[in-house]
From Swiss-Prot:
Keywords: Metal-binding, Zinc, Zinc-finger. InterPro entries: RNaseH-like_sf, Znf_BED. Pfam families: zf-BED (PF02892). It comes from Bos taurus. PANTHER family: EPM2A-INTERACTING PROTEIN 1, LOW QUALITY PROTEIN: ZINC FINGER BED DOMAIN-CONTAINING PROTEIN 5-LIKE. GO terms for molecular function: DNA binding; zinc ion binding. A zinc finger (BED-type) spans 109-165. May be derived from an ancient transposon that has lost its ability to translocate. This is Zinc finger BED domain-containing protein 5. Zn(2+) binds at residues 133, 136, 153, 158.
């Protein structure tokens, strides 16, 4: 039988079919008790016949069989442990010279230039090429290099070009865009993309201060509807993989806040110095909340950021405040020696003796200074006024509160204002906390004086004030002066406001006050538009007593502002404008003054001074003029106002409401009050597993 089989392999190899080979090999292995799985272990019989060349050797005495791979020597048939006993009768390499081979190689199609008429060029090896469409760049297998298959692709995928001749495709092939090498494109998996999208949505939820449930209840359904209308339902279903449950959004926000905090700590560790701004207030649940902001130089600018937002567990004393800040510093290994200034308001918990926070900070940071909010100084200064004007202000507030404290009265006033065609339909509430809006409150009251005269009950004791022209003249003046003071106050708020900015505004206000007082003495009221229009309306003049009270108020206001903002010889004037310095400033040593001379002699630096803000100008010179630039930045680092803390508590109150009393608002404040954008890609890379489950 063996001789018969070898004869068939020798003389009839060209006429064999795979079925005959398989049948005879099976019979041979069965007769000689050989494991058939050795021949078929690597896959199907078709794959074995195409990949291997079997060599069967027959010896008349022991009938040993050898199997030898012809080309793919790295593919060795694997043998199970159960066949080890029979492996002695199988040789993979035979030393016998009596070897007859049988092989079948896969067919390789060649590329023909005529295939370009179907819009196809070749890709890869010229001997074994793949077909590539010149229109859509799709790559087909070697077996697709047939005119019928190429024509089918052109007619089905690019029917608009099926009648084009070969010159069209040749021109398209030779275009510069097609000659560019293919760029590998890294595509995220669905889980990775869904996780990143979840972080992005959570980031915007935290920025808006909305509840976590808005992600699953509103954002995801809206996103699905938009995608379904703009694309199709298949893409809309992919949005289901984005995790936006309540707990998931909460975890995402904590991860984002942690990433921002990590970046901030790294910046503070490498910066030259920083200043602090701190304040404390109570939230809706009664907890004392501490907000601390930090101001530091990073790259070529001065940045402001939230350092920490913590709830004080015990009494909100200075010692407790200091311990909270100090714990954060020690935990993150931030050096206190870099602190140059601490800004606070004038409350007892924020400033005081050794036991208070500012003093304790100055104890661990000996070179640090302390400063008070300049807006608070301004608020104290404007409270001083003559008795006649103070009485009018108090009576105006009583009229407003009489209506605003009674909802029914407010509704009736609204109806009356609408019927009379008034521009406004409600009064503005005045409180001591909202002193910044006092000008708007008085202006609104004066504008609705006619409607209030009709509305007010004659039994109300202050109803006669609305018919008293002297009272209305004083009210018009107060509305004008408080509007002007509010405008000055608002101009001193915002980010990156320096001490120079505040004192410049105060200097301007002092000059205006003297000008206004002189104008009133000359009975010229053009500086006060509301008062001037009212005088024109009633065709009257201002009584001398009223003029005297106005002049007294303006001069007294100027004197009070000079007390809180004294005009002194500024030793840091060279920081404000280094190009006006002609004599060595007392605050600079000789070496720094020489550097300042070099700086002011540079024409490019002079041009940048007119283009950049003061903070950015000095920060950009750190590399070129390090000594004098660092001294200037140190002068610019202290906070001038408590604007950031006031804004922060407003955001805190809007985030942690009575409906969300159990919320940990610290991560939300970190995201909402920070200028640092979290690195979502870095956060996702830290996740070892990215599941689409909630």
């Amino acid at each position: 039988m063996i001789a018969h089989f070898l004869c068939i392999l020798s003389y009839n190899v060209n006429t064999f079919v795979i079925l005959n080979v398989y049948t005879k090999l099976t019979m041979f292995c069965t007769t000689n008790s050989l494991p058939m799985d050795l021949l078929l272990k690597q896959g199907s019989l078709k794959q074995e016949v195409e990949s291997f060349c079997y060599q069967i050797v027959s010896e008349s005495h022991d009938q040993k069989v050898g199997i030898l791979q012809s080309e793919d020597e790295h593919l060795q048939p694997s043998v199970s442990k159960n066949s080890e006993g029979e492996l002695s009768r199988v040789k993979f390499i035979s030393n016998s010279n009596k070897i007859t081979t049988f092989s079948k190689k896969p067919k390789r199609r060649k590329y023909d230039e005529s295939y370009l008429s179907f819009g196809f060029t070749y890709f890869g090896n010229r001997d074994a090429p793949h077909a590539q469409c010149v229109l859509c760049k799709k790559i087909l297998s070697n077996s697709s290099l047939a005119p019928s298959k190429l024509r089918r692709h052109l007619e089905t995928k690019h029917a608009a070009y099926k009648d084009k001749d070969i010159s069209f495709f040749k021109q398209h092939l030779d275009s510069p865009e097609n000659n560019k090498p293919p760029t590998p494109k890294i595509v995220n998996t669905d889980n990775e993309s869904a996780t990143e999208a979840s972080y992005n949505v959570s980031y915007h939820i935290a920025l808006s201060g909305e509840a976590h449930t808005i992600g699953e209840l509103l954002i995801k359904p809206c996103a699905k509807d938009v995608v379904m209308r703009m694309f199709d339902e298949q893409y809309s279903k992919k949005i289901d993989a984005v995790q936006l449950s309540n707990s998931t959004v909460a975890r995402r926000i904590k991860d984002l806040a942690a990433d921002i905090e990590e970046e901030l700590v790294c910046r503070l560790k490498i910066c030259d110095g920083f200043s602090l701004q701190l304040d404390e207030s109570a939230d809706v649940s009664g907890l004392a909340v501490l907000l601390v902001f930090v101001r530091y130089r990073f790259n070529k600018s001065i940045e402001e950021d939230l350092l920490l937002c913590e709830s004080l567990q015990s009494n909100a004393t200075g010692e407790e405040i200091f311990n909270c800040i100090n714990s954060f510093m020690q935990k993150h290994e931030i050096e206190w020696e870099k602190c140059v200034d601490v800004c606070s308001d004038a409350s007892r918990a924020m400033d005081g003796k050794i036991a208070e926070a500012v003093t304790l900070i100055k104890y661990v940071a000996p070179e640090s200074t302390s400063s008070h909010c300049l807006l608070y100084r301004h608020a104290l200064a404007v409270k001083t006024m003559p008795t006649s004007l103070k009485n009018v202000l108090d009576q105006a507030v009583q009229i407003i509160n009489y209506i605003k404290a009674r909802p029914h009265q407010s509704r009736l006033l609204k109806i009356l204002c609408e019927e009379m065609g008034a521009q406004h339909t409600a009064l503005l509430l005045n409180t001591e906390v909202r002193w910044l809006s006092r000008g708007k409150v008085l202006v609104r009251l004066f504008e609705l004086r006619r409607e209030l005269l009709v509305f007010m009950d004659s039994a109300f004791r202050l109803s006669d004030c609305l018919t008293n022209s002297s009272w209305l003249l004083r009210l018009a003046y107060l509305a004008d002066i408080f509007t002007k003071l509010n405008e000055v106050n608002l101009s001193m708020q915002g980010k990156n406001v320096t001490v120079f900015t505040v004192f410049d505004k105060m200097s301007s206000l002092l000059r205006k006050l003297e000008f206004w007082a002189s104008s009133v003495e000359e009975e010229n009221f053009d500086c006060f538009p509301t008062l001037s229009d009212f005088l024109t309306e009633i065709n009257s003049t201002v009584d001398k007593n009223i003029c005297s009270a106005i002049v007294q108020h303006l001069r007294g206001l100027r004197s009070t502002l000079l007390k809180y903002f004294p005009v002194t010889n500024d030793i840091h004037a060279w920081v404000r404008n280094p190009f006006t310095v002609t004599v060595k400033p007392a605050s600079l040593v000789a070496r720094d003054y020489e550097s300042l001379i070099d700086l002011t002699s540079d024409s490019q630096v002079k041009q940048s001074f007119s283009e950049l803000s003061l903070n950015d100008f000095w920060s950009s010179l750190i590399q070129e003029y390090p000594s004098v630039a660092r001294r200037a930045v140190r002068v610019l680092l202290p906070f001038a106002t408590m604007h950031l803390c006031e804004t922060g508590f407003s955001y805190y109150a809007a985030t942690k409401t009575k409906y969300r009393k159990r919320l940990d608002a610290a991560p939300h404040m970190r995201i909402r009050l920070s200028n640092i954008t979290p690195n979502i890609k870095r956060i996702c890379d830290k996740k070892t597993q990215k599941h689409c489950s909630h």
